[in-house]
Amino acid sequence: MLNIYNTDLKTNKFEKIKEFKPGSWISLVNPTEEEIKLVCSNLNIEDEFIKYPLDYEEQARIDVEDDMTLFVIDVPVIEEDKEGKSYSTMPLGLIVVRDEFFITVSLKKNRVIDSFEKGRVKGMYTYKKTRFVLQILYLNASFFLTDLKRINKNAENTVGILKKTMKNEELIQLLNLENSLVY
């Protein structure tokens, strides 16, 4: 999915737009090949920086090439199934192109980008690239801390139950919570 956002320089109003214009933010969530080609042709860039974060195993890193900077960070993901919640991470790419465009790339929707798209983050301007990167990093760290607190609380509750009953279910649940901390 391809969305383009811009903050108007005069009014500072954050809005969704249809065209690529300098100072805008391009959000790519599980993009198709056509969407990747559209972004690359309009911004006159190679597709490799866009494709790196689409690899679920991509490592967090910073890469600078010509007039582009790529930040790959891990964002926390909560998935629910019949056994409860599981915590993991996935890569999120932040790309600054010639200090004109800001691109975010992720495999699926996530809380970090969703917070910005829905206007929940105050003082966010698409044309202030460094500030935007720092705001994303700060919000991402906040989500990690929140999730770690939840995991710790669940682990403590499960340990308390284990002390009383020692059943396999609680032991498996505790092991699953401990495995979440690896991410």
Give names to the regions the model predicted.
Residues 1-183:
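Peripheral, non-transmembrane regulatory/ligand-interaction domains of membrane transport proteins
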